Design a protein with these regions (language model features):
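A short, glycine-centered helix-capping/turn motif at helix boundaries
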Residues: 184, 196, 232-234
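Terminal helix-turn-helix DNA-binding modules in bacterial transcription factors
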Residues: 175, 179, 188, 206-253, ...
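Sigma70-family region 2
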Residues: 85, 159-160, 206
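Short hydrophobic/aromatic patches on the structural cores and recognition surfaces of FHA
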Residues: 54, 70-71, 201, 225, ...
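Short, conserved glycine- and acidic-residue-centered signature motifs
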Residues: 44, 166, 218
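An amphipathic alpha-helical interaction segment
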Residues: 96-105, 109, 119-182, 192, ...
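A short, N-terminal "cap"/entry segment at the start of jelly-roll beta-barrel domains
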Residues: 1-23, 39, 116, 133-136
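N-terminal regulatory/effector-sensing and dimerization cores
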Residues: 2, 19-113
Length: 274
């Protein structure tokens, strides 16, 4: 073990004949340090890290990410790595640095070579297992290390697939709701459309877009109402009916809440501009 200020570092004992296949260069734990920074131009290693506490910033080949507690990140071999702790909330993280043909193949085979930041992915358990093997100083450990490394890549792969699924569902939900602007909102129709329960649907939509499906539809209705007020001569009552509000008074109250003025005031203000 090599203990630097604010870091606990281990080198892993490996048999030399396995080093071309996979080489574990370094592993350990970085403790909170607001001055912590690493620069690694054209990195010769892949870096896999899990943030246990705090947060920080990563720059990798022109892209910037902001990992926080509970996130993992995967910095690619051959790229410029620059990362550092947040000064107000410096991170505690666990890491491994690896290289070799096997790692290259795993990254490509699992489809993770294009992703650096894994939000909410906990690789802490696997990385700590590798740190413990290094701490013990075992020599005949390559197969165990490879098994753990494979678990890490599989979890990263699953995380990407989950994000792709969520992103696809998000677009599907939005597309469906966009057809409901002039209809009465029925949550059960959206749930049926994506084959999810109401609680699952609301939770998923809010995770992706930060608002509930109902709020999304309401915002869209008000945006369309603004267009109708400017571009048509429809009365407020007719617009309320067209957008399936229960009555013009409820519509006017919602409009004022969202737009900061009544529908009539909104129309007059745009007539004056013309």
């Amino acid at each position: 073990m090599n203990v630097k200020e604010k870091e606990e570092l281990y080198r892993i004992n490996q048999k030399s004949e396995t080093s071309d296949l996979v080489r574990f260069h370094l592993c350990g734990t970085t403790f909170p340090d607001k001055a912590y920074t690493i620069k690694r131009p054209s990195s010769a290693v892949w870096c896999i890290e899990y943030v246990e506490e705090g947060k920080g910033t990563i720059h990798i080949d022109g892209d910037t990410f902001f990992p926080k507690a509970g996130d993992s990140y995967f910095l690619h071999v051959g790229k410029d790595h620059h990362y550092y702790s947040d000064k107000a909330d410096p991170w505690k993280k666990h890491f491994i640095n690896v290289s070799g043909k096997l790692v290259d193949s795993l990254a490509e085979g699992y489809g993770v070579s294009g992703t650096a930041h894994f939000v909410g992915l906990d690789l802490g358990g696997e990385i700590k297992e590798i740190i413990e093997i290094a701490r013990r100083g075992d020599m005949d450990n390559t197969q165990e290390l490879i098994s753990i490394l494979n678990k890490i890549f599989f979890k990263m792969h699953k995380s990407i697939k989950k994000e792709e699924e969520i992103s696809g569902l998000g677009a599907e939900m939005k597309d469906f709701l966009n057809t409901q602007i002039t209809s009465k909102f029925h949550m059960e129709l959206l749930c049926k459309h994506i084959s999810r329960s109401e609680s699952q649907t609301i939770r998923l939509f809010k995770k992706i877009f930060g608002i509930t499906p109902y709020t999304y539809v309401l915002n869209k209705k008000i945006s369309f109402a603004k267009k109708l007020l400017i571009d048509t001569s429809l009365s407020v009552k007719e617009i309320a009916t067209k957008l399936c509000f229960s009555d013009e008074y409820y519509f006017s109250n919602i409009f004022k809440e969202k737009a900061g003025c009544s529908p009539s005031q909104y129309r007059r203000s745009h007539e004056e501009k013309d």
